Each structure stands twice: as C-alpha cells, then as structure tokens.
Amino acid sequence: MPGKFQTGLRVLATCLFALLVLGGILVAYVTGYQFIHTDRHHLSFGLYGAILGLHLLSQSLFAFLEHRKMRGGGRCPSGKSTVVLCIAAYQEDPEYLRKCLRSVRRLSYPHLRVIMVVDGNTEEDRYMMDIFREVMGSEGTCCYIWDKNYHESEEGGQEGERGVQEMVKNFQYVCIMQKWGGKREVTYTAFRALGDSVAYVQVCDSDTVLDPACTAEMLRILEEDPEVGGVGGDVQILNKYESWISFLSSFRYWMAFNVERACQSYFGCVQCISGPLGMYRNSLLQYFLEDWYHQTFLGQKCSFGDDRHLTNRVLSMGFRTKYTARSRCLTETPTRYLRWLNQQTRWSKSYFREWLYNALWFHKHHLWMTYESVVTGFFPFFLVATVVQLFYRGRVWNILLFLLTVQLVGILKATYACILRGNAEMIFMSLYSLLYMTSLLPAKIFAVITIKKSGWGTSGRRKLVVNFMGMVPVSVWFCILLGGLVYTAYCQSHDPFTETELLFLLTGAILYGCYWVALLSLYLALIARRCGKRQELYNLALEEVSEPEPAAKAIKP
C-alpha cells in the first residue's frame, strides 16, 4: 500500500509539473510580455523568447557535462558476456550492405554472434543472402530461406520455426530470408529466435558502417550500471557529400545525438535509441517482446517507429537509457528531397504517437524527461501559430524580423556546435533552419493529421520509389505563406513605411542578404564540388576484410 501511495503521489506531482510547464509557456506566448522593446516595438525581447533561450542554454550545458563524463571512460568490458548483433535488411543497396557486413567482421568484441534477417524471400531478395555468404565466409555460417515468418506459419509450420532457432543456437553467423512483413517482423524474428540464450542484443540496420569499438563501448555502460536497460551510440551520415540534402542532414544528425540525446543521457532518459546503433539487455527484450510486436494505436497495428517503441518499453519498466559518443557508426540518409521528406514525416508520426505512450511513464524518471517532452512536443504548434501571426500582421518588418531571428538562432547553435566538435564546417548547420521552417515544420503537422496512416514510409535503397504525398503539406504551407505575403503587400500599399521602419528594413535586408551570400559562397566553394559523388570521405576506417572463404550453403525447408 505505501508503494502504491508513493507512486500515486509521483504521478500527481509529475502531471502538475507538466501542466505548470505547458501553462507557463502558454501564458508567456499569449500575453506577449516583453522585458525590453523599442518605441514602436520594431525590436523586443520578451518572456517567451527568454524561456526558449533558457531551454537551449540548459540543453547545451547538460550535453556538455555528459560529454565530459564520456571522455572519462571507464573499465573495459569483461569480454565474457554473450552478445548478438541483429541486422534488419530490406531491399538494400548492395554497396551499402557489403560495407555494413565488412564493418561487422572488424568488430573488436570476441565471439560476437551475428543474425541478419532479410524482409523478403523472393529471387529479387536473394542477392542480400549471397552478399552475406560472400563477406562472412563459410566457417560458422549458415543461411536459411523461410517460406513463412513467425506470424504466418500454418499448422505444422513449427518445422520452420525450429529450423531458425536451431541455426541461431548453433552457428555464429546466420542469415534468414523470410516472407515480407516489415521491419518489425524481421526484428521480432531475430529476438524470438534468440530466446534467453544471450545476455545482450545489439541492433543495426543493413546500411550502417560500424566502428570496431562500438560494441565494447555500449556494453561497458550496460555492465557498469544494472539500472541501465538500453544504450545508443553516435549515428552520423555515411553519404554526407552525395547531395545537398544529405549534407544538411548530417548536421541535424550531429545535433540530435551529440546535444539532444547527450542531454537526455545526463538524466538517464534517452527517448529513442536509434536503429543503426543500439544495445539492450536481452532479458528486457524477451519480457516485452510480444507487447512490442503487437503494439496498436487507435485500433490499428503499428508498423513503424520500432526503435522508439523499443526504447519506450525499456523506460516503461523504470530502467534508464543512455547515450555514448564513444560508440560510433555511419548510416545512409536519403539524398533526394522527396524521399527525405517522406522519411521525416514517418519519423514525426512515430514521435507524436510514442509521445503519448511515453507520457504514461514520466513519473518513473527524472523531471527533465517530462519538461523536455512538453517543450519539444508542443513547440511545432507554437511555431506555426507564430509564423502565421507574423505573416498576416500586414507589416513587412514582422516577416523580415522573423527570418532574421530564425537565422540568428541557427548561427548561435552552429557556433556552439563548432566549438563542441572543433570543426568549422559545422557553421553550415545554420542553413538547416530554413529547411526546417519550409519543409519539416509542415511535415510534422501533416504527421499529426495522418497519424493513423502506416507503412515503411521510406522505400528500399536498391529500388527507390517516388512518393509525392509528402509534397501535400509543403504545398499547403507555401500557399499559406504566399497568402500572408500578398496580404502584407496589400496592407503596406495603403500604409507607407515610416522613416524608422524603412531604416530597420534596409538594415535587416542587408544583414539577411549578407548572411546568405556568405554561407552560399562558402558552400559553393567548399562543399558543392564534393556533392553528387560517392566518395569514401569517412571518419571511420573501412579496411577491406580478408578474401572471403568459399560460400556457405543455403538451406531451404
């Protein structure tokens, strides 16, 4: 009874805290209270801006403190714990898959077992199994073609299940091709086949290049603290210079992991252990495996957001989740705008869906988890309201001031990233703010509206499928902004600029123009010439493994 009473108090206190945070932001936004301002409010600094500034400052500070703890290192893992690496593969680009498997062969952890499950068992998918046999060699390797999967086995189909489990138990390297079912299905197969035969499970995508020490670094954190249930590593971009969209995405990735997740890790509440590089206690996975697989939302089975829901399941049990920049990998990101937009929409859907689930467990973790979830969850809606309000006030200066503010915040964050990373190239991160405002922001709102729609979201990399649905919210957003510009032009034509306003406009326009001229000139001079080529300009060594041994034989039931 005392335990239930304490839990009830924590739930009540957490709910009140969340309402206090949201209410405070809402009051600051609605009242528009300003600390300082010019005579005609051309420039001002208010309570709402102070709250957002304090949030960014706090987040950066805690991220810095967590990085300082990471640099301290710790004891090396014993090497006695059993670890299995599970790779999910779906229509993968052969070049990326080879790089992934070669990096797996270079992992420094002894006796690491590997399971790759291919989502598809047709002849078109066979090349992935062939690459697995080619790279992994024949010693301790077995491949299996399954006509079904765990959830489509008919009566008497236990033979296929037993075959999978026997191979996983007896071979070090296993590749399974199974009937198509989505990423969650192939991940389930790997986890289910393992059972309780291992202590830790590492996850990886088939487009990921792993650093040799990544397994040992994540395992070290799990062995040091029994209260940590999962840990993620630093995921950066493999094809950074392949296009402008992948180049800008590389900065977003760095900020997401080395600032946002590092800050969450300081409080032990990382809210998403990314699929390309993560590790979990297998005992936890086996405990909630069925609930994770059968997850539903508004009566529909969930088919995306697997990684975030895995993390949420760990958090729901009261275990902490951590991030370490000492464990690194490189992964592919979309190089085309439409594919990137669809990916971001899918991720946004899973974010908002999992936000609701995550809220059930706020009371089990540090208050920072509650605070950050409220701020980041509601921020896009406040931002949309701000943009619409400024574009429809009928003054050109309001629009220009908003654009200047967006870029100023971007420059400040980019400067911090330059200092923290020690790389001047991070200054280009400020360009991402425009991509966020024009594309990612409407995609987030669209994700909320269409949150029940499911699917892979992003096509396989071998055969790219163009999906124009992502352009719908962007087109609507541009129409809204265009309407604001037309309305502003109409209002200003009937209300000429004052001398002071004209001075502000000219100064602001010159500053904004100089910013873009400087950044675009640097981009064209230093970066553009490198884009469009698959250059191996990686931070991680990619030595070739030794010549593969004769291929292992594939088994078909």
Curated annotation (Swiss-Prot):
Residues 32-44, 389-398, 452-463, 523-557 are extracellular. It is a multi-pass membrane protein. Disulfide bonds: none annotated. Keywords: Cell membrane, Cytoplasmic vesicle, Glycosyltransferase, Golgi apparatus, Membrane, Transferase, Transmembrane, Transmembrane helix. It is an enzyme of class 2 (transferase). One of its GO terms (molecular function) is hyaluronan synthase activity. It comes from the Eukaryota. It is found in: Cell membrane; Golgi apparatus membrane; Golgi apparatus, trans-Golgi network membrane; Cytoplasmic vesicle. Its EC number is 2.4.1.212. It catalyses: [hyaluronan](n) + UDP-N-acetyl-alpha-D-glucosamine = N-acetyl-beta-D-glucosaminyl-(1->4)-[hyaluronan](n) + UDP + H(+); N-acetyl-beta-D-glucosaminyl-(1->4)-[hyaluronan](n) + UDP-alpha-D-glucuronate = [hyaluronan](n+1) + UDP + H(+). GO terms for biological process: extracellular matrix assembly; hyaluronan biosynthetic process; polysaccharide biosynthetic process. The chain crosses the membrane at residues 11-31, 45-65, 368-388, 399-419, 431-451, 464-484, 502-522. InterPro entries: Nucleotide-diphossugar_trans. CDD domains: GT2_HAS (cd06434). SUPFAM superfamilies: Nucleotide-diphospho-sugar transferases. GO terms for cellular component: cytoplasmic vesicle; Golgi membrane; plasma membrane. O-GlcNAcylation increases the hyaluronan synthase activity, HAS3 stability and its plasma membrane residence. The concentration of UDP-GlcNAc controls the level of O-GlcNAc modification. Pfam families: Glyco_tranf_2_3. Its cofactor is Mg(2+). Pathway: Glycan biosynthesis; hyaluronan biosynthesis. Residues 1-10, 66-367, 420-430, 485-501 are cytoplasmic. Catalyzes the addition of GlcNAc or GlcUA monosaccharides to the nascent hyaluronan polymer. Therefore, it is essential to hyaluronan synthesis a major component of most extracellular matrices that has a structural role in tissues architectures and regulates cell adhesion, migration and differentiation. This is one of three isoenzymes responsible for cellular hyaluronan synthesis. Belongs to the NodC/HAS family. PANTHER family: HYALURONAN SYNTHASE, HYALURONAN SYNTHASE 3. This is Hyaluronan synthase 3. It comes from Xenopus laevis (African clawed frog). The gene is has3.
